[in-house]
Amino acid sequence: MWDIEVSSSDISQKDIEIVCETMKSNWLSMGPKVKEFESMWAKELGINYISAVSSGTAALHLACLCCEFTYGDEVIVPALTFVATANAVKYTGATPIISDIESKDNLILSIEEIRKNITSKTKGIIIVHYAGYTYNIEEISKLAKEYNLYLIEDAAHAITSSYNNKSLGTYGDLACFSFYPNKNITTGEGGVIATNNKDFHEKIRSLRTHGMTTETWNRYNSSISTYDVNNLGYNYRMDDLRASLGISQFKNMKRNKIHRKNLVNKYRELLLGYKEITIPFLTNNTDSSNYIFVIFVKNPILKEKMITDLRNEKIQTSFHYTPLHKFSYYKSKNLLPIVEEVS
């Protein structure tokens, strides 16, 4: 239907061959390929511990469990994000405090909103690196420490992003990445959790596999044949098939980033002359993954005409995102003027 899609998975012949090799190996579940994929990410981020899981949402849920969010707790989240960010908080029984973004130029959780929304019930902050950008991350990290709050980075958009030569995903207590098919690299479904906290890492390893003390691959390669269950865990494992695709995709990740950057520069060059269009992040200093390219069209009639005209040319567009507090489940009368203006 579309000549140009909003996103499409770039699956090469090499990707297919590597996955087929794993299919022939007779080990399909979580095993050596998952371990290899985790090691690649640990080296890439310069972080001590990586755990591969079944999705970015699973990563967020496990991160929230590590922080022991529970009933009566509050966790500050941005209004401009995919719903999984808030859902992961709700899974624990805690309440997501949906907060406004910084500005039309920087679509990131506002540090002033964070300050305003901190209460005696606040236990954590989840910052979303929207479109692969961040803003005030160093100050937000300091603020979290000042108030003894956990900081989780939702880095689903931020594969390869960095700020001040430090990878996004290494500023908080935990960080969650997603490899959904529309992301910069894909495993079909999947994600990883990054942390430097050994206790968190060990808890994640247990929780992702039903709370078991050993994993199938470990038992296969040792004399240990039994296990204990010491947590109420989940089936959040990544399998070796998906990890194999991730390993292959990983090798082209930097080249993909350069290509995206060139496209962003071209789009900006062509669109900056139109007063009806606003382009965010023009002065933002993040070395971005350029996950998505976002524009604002203030006139709603013009916006719909642009969408229709592009559709007629078989060019797909998308809306990222409806603010959380506008969904039926999270409906709120709270006024969040900046995110409401940009949406």
Identify the residue ranges that each predicted region occupies.
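PLP-dependent aminotransferase class I/II
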Residues: 34-39, 47-48, 112, 124-128, ...
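Phosphate-binding glycine-rich loop
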Residues: 27-74, 88-92, 98-100, 166
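Active-site phosphate-binding strand-loop segment of PLP-dependent enzymes
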Residues: 104-187, 192-200
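Short beta-strand->loop structural element characteristic of the AMP-binding/adenylate-forming
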Residues: 95-105, 318
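Conserved coil-to-alpha-helix start sites within the AMP-binding
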Residues: 81-86
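Helix C-cap/helix->beta junction micro-motif
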Residues: 92, 146-147, 313
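N-terminal "arm"/small-domain region of PLP-dependent enzymes with the aminotransferase-like
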Residues: 1-28, 32, 228-230
